[in-house]
Regions:
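Post-transcriptional modification and biogenesis factors for structured RNAs
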Residues: 1-141
Length: 141
């Protein structure tokens, strides 16, 4: 999905599956996205901060703001962070992030990682389209 929304990189903290396993589920789309691995959440945060990348985490925590009321700032690169279904976004990343959540009026309280990422990507692209040219989107995602 990252490639479909114009993202150029996928930052992964922890284990990165073999490329052949990723390709089996994503097809040729994986060829359009660089996968950048990080051993620890701290390594990722340090990298993002050194590069001036905004970290925006999707997580159900008290300080999170609803996605529908969040205004993305496209003055610097944006990194959308989602955690796995079991443990969520690591605290080391949450404490260094702007935190948002996806409002869900139904009976469930969480989505799987891919669904959550797609919703965050969609809202980010939607806001970007309203603010600038779609051709330049990959410069910021």
């Amino acid at each position: 999905s990252a490639a479909c929304f114009g993202a150029e990189r996928l930052y992964v903290v922890g284990h990165v599956p073999e490329r052949s396993r990723i390709k089996a589920s994503s097809g040729s789309l994986i060829d359009y996205v660089d996968i950048v691995p990080f051993a620890t959440p701290r390594d990722f945060v340090d990298f993002a901060k050194s590069e001036g990348i905004q970290i925006i985490a999707g997580e159900l925590v008290e300080e999170a703001r609803p996605l529908s009321h969040y205004d993305f700032n496209f003055n610097s690169h944006v990194c959308l962070v989602v955690g796995n279904e079991t443990s969520g976004v690591p605290p080391e990343i949450i404490h260094q992030s702007q935190v948002i959540y996806i409002e869900m009026p139904g009976v469930g309280y969480c989505l799987n990682t891919a669904q959550a990422a797609n919703l965050l990507l969609y809202e980010c692209v939607k806001q970007y389209n309203k603010s600038q040219s779609i051709d330049a989107l990959s410069d910021y995602l």
